UniProtKB/Swiss-Prot annotation:
Belongs to the UPF0161 family. One of its GO terms (cellular component) is plasma membrane. It comes from Pseudomonas aeruginosa (strain UCBPP-PA14). SMART domains: Haemolytic. Could be involved in insertion of integral membrane proteins into the membrane. Its main location: membrane. Keywords: Cell inner membrane, Cell membrane, Membrane. It comes from the Bacteria. PANTHER family: MEMBRANE PROTEIN INSERTION EFFICIENCY FACTOR-RELATED. This is Putative membrane protein insertion efficiency factor. HAMAP family: UPF0161_YidD. It is found in: Cell inner membrane. Signal peptide: none annotated.
Length: 86
């Protein structure tokens, strides 16, 4: 799934985007943001972050610098190590 999404974004970047020109209000552009989000967070969360970004990319939003959030490791109880004495 991840490779399919990346392939679709790359197709857009090389085949469609040059025809319509730069229109994104953000840096990095929405397609680059989504590509990076999928690489960092995986297909599901990265796709969600990219979709949220696309919904904010409209004429009434000021845009600006909006990097992909860093991955936050959340260990569930099954992966935590017990401290001595517990």
């Amino acid at each position: 799934m991840k490779f399919l999404l990346i392939g679709l974004i790359r197709f857009y970047q090389y085949a469609i985007s040059p025809l319509i020109g730069p229109r994104c209000r953000f840096y990095p552009s929405c397609s680059h943001y989504t590509l990076e989000a999928i690489r960092v967070h995986g297909a599901l969360r990265g796709g969600y972050l990219g979709a949220r970004r696309l919904l904010r990319c409209h004429p009434w939003h000021p845009g600006g610098y909006d990097p992909v959030p860093e991955r936050q490791e959340q260990a569930c109880a099954c992966h935590r190590t017990a401290k001595p004495g517990e």
